[in-house]
């Protein structure tokens, strides 16, 4: 499941990045070569960038690739009960952060339903939508890990210390 999710997320991020690069390149060529550019390229690039960032954040969570300070946790591995309590506390804090981000993103989403972007005309609610979806997805993953009492996945962070 994780592998399929990672592939879909990587493809979505690559598509966003490729489209942004093409839009900016074409806009630069048109603007400096012909004196006129694509008005929607900046707005669409901004929207794609926001989506790409939150897709990446969501894809990084199950792999344990978010930045973490593991110095203390690595020392706690020798004390299983303390390590389990620290793991539960970390997951609860992640869940709290997701709730707060989702709450704020939902409020911005509702406000954005009535307004539209200036150039393209898409609903402004599309800008906070990836934050809402990402926080819900990460929150569900953190809740499942908390309920299952899964040990922390240090990802590649242990290689750096």
Language-model features and meaning:
Residues 1-161:
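Alpha-helical transmembrane segments and membrane-interface helix-loop junctions
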